C-alpha cells in the first residue's frame, strides 16, 4: 500500500514542503530564522486573537480596555506582553533573515526575494498600526507624526492624510480603521508567506557556499525539523525571559499615559525596530526628501539583485565584501541608536553621516568592491 503522505492531495503538499523536501546538507543556523518567523507569526496571530476578544477600538475606552486586559482577564497580562514583545522578536528574526539573504546572495531568487521585501513592508505597516491601538501618548503622537508625513506628497498630500484619518485629526475613525487593518493584515501576510515558500521551493534553498547543491541533498525531516525545533525552543525561552522579567524593557513609558491631543511628549519616537528608518527620515531637512529616503531605505533591498556584480554568489569567499557588509550592519546599529536620541548636536550630524554612509555602501561601495574582487580573482 502506497504511503498516504505521498498520495493524499492535502498531505502530499505538506510532505513535499516539510518532510521529503530535498535540502542542502550544509545550511547553517542562519537558515533557522525562516521557520522562526513562521513561529513568531503564529504566536502573534494567536495572542492577537485573544487580545481582540477584550479590546475596544474606541478613543474613550481603548486605553482602559488594555488596562482591563492586564488586570482582570485571566493571564491577560501574559497575552498582552507576549504580543508586544513577540513583535520585537519578530523584527529581530526579520532583520537577521534579510541580513542572511544579503550575505549569502539569496536575492538571486528574484521572486522569493521581492515577495520577502513586500512582506517586510506589510509587517512594518502592521506593527505601526498595532502600536497605535493602546491609545497612549506615544501611540497617538506616533500615529499623528507618521501619517502626517504623507502630506509631503505634492498636490494630493493633505487630502490623502485627512482621508486616512477619517477627519481633521487622529481620532475615533482613525483608531477604528487601524484596528480593522491590524486585524486583517496578518492573515494577508500568512497568504503571502505561502507564496514566498512556493517560489522558494521552485528553486530549492540556497546554502552558505552559494554553489549548486543538487549533488548533496538530504531530506528535510528529521535533520532540519529537529534543528528548527531547537531554534523554536530557544526563541520561546528568550521571549518568555523578556516577558516575565522585564516586559517593558523595549516599550516607552509615555505609552502608560492616556492619549492627550493637547500635550505633546518631549521626544516622539517609534518602537526600536523602526528607529533606523526614523533616523534616516530625520536626517534630511526637507519633508518630502525625508519621506522618500525613508521609503527608499527599505525599497533599496529590491535593487540588491541588480547591484550584485560579483562572479560568486555568496560572500563566504569574498573577505572585502564581508568587511563592507559588517560595516553596513554597524551603520544600521548606529542609525538605530541615533533614532532614539533627541534632535540636537552631535546626534543630528552623526545621523546624517550614518544615513549617507548607508546609501553609499549599498549603491556604490559594495558593487565597486565586487568588481575589485573579480579583478583580484582574475575573473
UniProtKB/Swiss-Prot annotation:
Transmembrane segments: 33-53, 77-98, 113-133, 178-198, 226-246, 288-308, 320-340, 347-367
Cofactor note: Binds 2 heme b groups non-covalently.
SUPFAM superfamilies, alphabetized: a domain/subunit of cytochrome bc1 complex (Ubiquinol-cytochrome c reductase), Transmembrane di-heme cytochromes
The protein's required cofactors: heme b
Membrane topology listed for this record: Multi-pass membrane protein
One GO biological process term: mitochondrial electron transport, ubiquinol to cytochrome c
UniProt keyword Protease present: no
One GO term describing the cellular component: respiratory chain complex III
Keyword line: Electron transport, Heme, Iron, Membrane, Metal-binding, Mitochondrion, Mitochondrion inner membrane, Respiratory chain, Transmembrane, Transmembrane helix, Transport, Ubiquinone
InterPro entries: Cyt_b/b6_C (IPR005798), Cyt_b/b6_C_sf (IPR036150), Cyt_b/b6_N (IPR005797), Cytb/b6-like_sf (IPR027387), Cytochrome_b (IPR030689), Cytochrome_b_C_euk/bac (IPR048260), Cytochrome_b_N_euk/bac (IPR048259), Di-haem_cyt_TM (IPR016174)
One Gene Ontology MF term: ubiquinol-cytochrome-c reductase activity
Binding site for a ubiquinone: 201
UniProt superkingdom: Eukaryota
Residues annotated for heme b b566 binding in this entry: 97, 196
Pfam families referenced in this protein's UniProt entry, alphabetically: Cytochrom_B_C (PF00032), Cytochrome_B (PF00033)
Record's subcellular location: Mitochondrion inner membrane
Effect after changing residue 324 to T: In strain: Isolate S98
Its biological purpose: Component of the ubiquinol-cytochrome c reductase complex (complex III or cytochrome b-c1 complex) that is part of the mitochondrial respiratory chain. The b-c1 complex mediates electron transfer from ubiquinol to cytochrome c. Contributes to the generation of a proton gradient across the mitochondrial membrane that is then used for ATP synthesis.
Family: Belongs to the cytochrome b family.
Other facts: Heme 1 (or BL or b562) is low-potential and absorbs at about 562 nm, and heme 2 (or BH or b566) is high-potential and absorbs at about 566 nm.
The protein's name: Cytochrome b
Protein source organism: Callospermophilus madrensis (Sierra Madre ground squirrel)
Taxon lineage: Eukaryota, Metazoa, Chordata, Craniata, Vertebrata
Gene: MT-CYB
Amino acid at each position: 500500500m502506497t504511503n498516504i503522505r505521498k498520495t493524499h492531495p492535502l498531505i502530499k503538499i505538506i510532505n513535499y514542503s516539510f518532510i521529503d523536501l530535498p535540502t542542502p546538507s550544509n545550511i547553517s543556523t542562519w537558515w533557522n530564522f525562516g521557520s522562526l518567523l513562521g513561529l513568531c507569526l503564529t504566536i502573534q496571530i494567536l495572542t492577537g486573537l485573544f487580545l481582540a476578544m477584550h479590546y475596544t477600538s474606541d478613543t474613550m475606552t481603548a486605553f482602559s480596555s488594555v488596562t482591563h486586559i492586564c488586570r482582570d482577564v485571566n493571564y491577560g497580562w501574559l497575552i498582552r506582553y507576549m504580543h508586544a514583545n513577540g513583535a520585537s522578536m519578530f523584527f529581530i528574526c526579520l532583520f537577521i533573515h534579510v541580513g542572511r539573504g544579503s550575505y549569502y546572495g539569496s536575492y538571486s531568487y528574484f521572486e522569493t526575494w521581492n515577495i520577502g521585501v513586500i512582506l517586510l513592508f506589510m509587517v512594518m505597516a502592521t506593527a505601526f498600526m498595532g502600536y497605535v491601538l493602546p491609545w497612549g501618548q506615544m501611540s497617538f503622537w506616533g500615529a499623528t507624526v507618521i501619517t502626517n508625513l504623507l502630506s509631503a506628497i505634492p498636490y494630493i498630500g493633505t487630502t490623502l492624510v485627512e482621508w486616512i484619518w477619517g477627519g481633521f485629526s487622529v481620532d475615533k475613525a482613525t483608531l477604528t480603521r487601524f484596528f480593522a487593518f491590524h486585524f486583517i493584515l496578518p492573515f494577508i501576510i500568512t497568504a503571502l508567506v505561502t507564496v514566498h515558500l512556493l517560489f522558494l521551493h521552485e528553486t530549492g534553498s540556497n546554502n552558505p557556499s552559494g554553489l549548486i547543491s543538487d549533488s548533496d541533498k538530504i531530506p528535510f525531516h528529521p535533520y532540519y525539523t529537529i534543528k528548527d525545533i531547537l531554534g523554536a525552543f530557544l526563541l520561546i525561552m528568550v521571549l518568555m525571559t523578556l516577558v516575565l522579567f522585564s516586559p517593558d524593557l523595549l516599550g516607552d513609558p509615555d505609552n502608560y499615559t492616556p492619549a492627550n491631543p493637547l500635550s505633546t511628549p518631549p521626544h516622539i519616537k517609534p518602537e526600536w525596530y523602526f528607529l533606523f528608518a526614523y533616523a534616516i527620515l530625520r536626517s534630511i531637512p526637507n519633508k518630502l526628501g525625508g519621506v522618500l529616503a525613508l521609503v527608499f531605505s527599505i525599497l533599496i533591498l529590491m535593487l540588491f539583485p541588480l547591484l550584485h556584480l560579483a562572479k560568486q554568489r555568496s560572500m563566504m569567499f569574498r573577505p572585502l565584501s564581508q568587511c563592507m557588509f559588517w560595516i553596513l550592519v554597524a551603520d544600521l546599529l548606529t542609525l538605530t541608536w541615533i533614532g532614539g536620541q533627541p534632535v540636537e548636536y552631535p546626534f543630528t550630524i552623526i545621523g546624517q553621516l550614518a544615513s549617507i554612509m548607508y546609501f553609499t555602501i549599498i549603491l556604490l561601495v559594495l558593487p565597486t568592491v565586487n568588481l575589485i574582487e573579480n579583478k583580484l580573482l582574475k575573473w
